[in-house]
Amino acid sequence: IWYTGIIEHASQTDYRRYNIRPDHPAIVKGKAGSPYAIKDYYDVDPDLATDVPGRMKEFENLVSRTHRAGLKVIIDFVPNHVARQYHSDAQPDGTTQLGANDDPNYSFSPYNNFYYIPQSELHGQFDMTGNALEPYHEFPAKATGNNRFDAYPNINDWYETVKLNYGVDYQNGGTCHFSPTPDTWTKMLDILLFWSSKNIDGFRCDM
C-alpha cells in the first residue's frame, strides 16, 4: 500500500508550540502545502498525527498494522527538490543539514547541495508576501525545483521548492561531476537508510 505525504512538508499550519519552524506563506502553495515540498526528510508530517509529539511512533505503529494485514508499505521519496525553507529539526545526531556547508558564491559546485544564483536576491513573479507582515527574502537565490536557474520563478513554476544538486552542472551542458562522490548522494543515502530502518518495504520516487 502506498502511503503518500508521510514525510513532513511545508505548510501554513502553525506548529511552533511543537518546536516546528513555521513556513513563510508566500512560498507555500495553498493552506496545507504540497506533499512534494519536503521541509524535513527525517520527520512525519504533523498534519497526519493524532498526537503530534508522538507522530513518528504513530507511523511505526501504522507500518506494523499494515504488515499484520499481509500488506507491504511504500512511501514517497522526493529526491529532486525540497521546500525553499528546508530545515530538519528531527535529523539524527551525526547528520548535517542540507546546504549547511554550501558555498553560495558558486552557481554550481559538486560539493554544494543546492544550485545558486550568486549575488542575486529571489525576485519571484508571484505574491512574495502572502498573508505575512513582511515579504519572503532569499539571498542568494537558489535554483527552483523545476530546473529554473534564475532568480525569477513565476506562478507556473515549482516556486515553493529548490533544486537539489547531485553533481550535474545543468548550465554547462549537463556535465557530470561524480568523483569524488557528491555530498548530496551521501546525505540522501542516510535519509533512505533512516526510513528503511522503520521497516518500510519500498519507496515511490517522485521527481
PLM regions and their residue ranges:
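Conserved beta-strand positions in the central sheet of alpha/beta enzyme cores
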Residues: W2, I74, R204-D206
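Substrate-binding/active-site clefts of carbohydrate-active enzymes
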Residues: G5-F194, K198
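Surface-exposed extracellular loop regions of Gram-negative outer-membrane beta-barrel proteins
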Residues: L193, F203-R204
